[in-house]
Amino acid sequence: MSESITALLPELWVAIGQTFLMLGIGLSAAIVLGGPLGVLLFLLTPGQSLANKPAYLVLSWVVNTVRSFPFIILLVALVPLTRIIAGTSIGPLAAAVPLSVAAIPYFARLVEQSIREVPRGVIEAAHAMGASELQIVWRVLVLEARSGLILALTVLAVSFLSYSAIAGVVGGGGIGDLAIRYGYYRFQTDVMLLTVALLIVLVQICLLYTSDAADDSLRV
């Protein structure tokens, strides 16, 4: 191991922790807010139980608008909001704000697409048996689409792992910040290669874990 990497090990562990912090907050926001938003988008679709075309079009437009923003631009545009929520515009907690804002509509659309795969006959059968709307959402839609939802969460985690690296450009901390400061500005190629290898390992862990979870859900 080169001397530069050995000297950076303490910072490297901190950077990994910051990356997990940003990713954890962003994914939590996506699940808690983006999940229900995706279900609502599906239910507002014409032909569904809460069908409301104007509301669906407005909500869908908002989701598409936020998703269309390049993350680096969204990161800068949300600096005032970040300062209000986090009290600062730098650091992993500050970077978690735009990550969460980007993750919510992204995951919502993935959830909507996953739920659309549920056979319409299953939903109609649940309605015919007198199931409430909440029961249909939880025991039919979510249950039937569970493997698709797990894979959607995988896509989200992998995508936003790269987004967390982008946050390093504006002082967001994490592995990306380490790569920028040492690998790019100081031309330490070994550090750059190490951070790339770490990101690849993290992506592979995400893919391995969630693919196993998806397989298990299909066996239930």
What are these regions (language model features)?
Residues 209-214:
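Conserved small/polar residues in nucleotide/adenosyl-binding loops
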Residues 115-145, 185:
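Short helix-to-coil transition segments within interhelical loops
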Residues 81-82, 152-202, 208:
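Non-cytoplasmic
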Residues 32-37, 93-97, 101-123, 154, ...:
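Membrane-embedded alpha-helices of multi-pass transport/permease systems
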Residues 40-77, 99, 104, 110-113, ...:
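Cytoplasmic-entry segments and transmembrane alpha-helices of multi-pass inner-membrane transporters
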Residues 12-43:
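Transmembrane alpha-helix signature in integral membrane proteins
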Residues 14, 18-22, 64-106, 191, ...:
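Loop-to-helix entry region at the N-terminal start of transmembrane alpha-helices
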Residues 24, 133-164:
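Transmembrane alpha-helices
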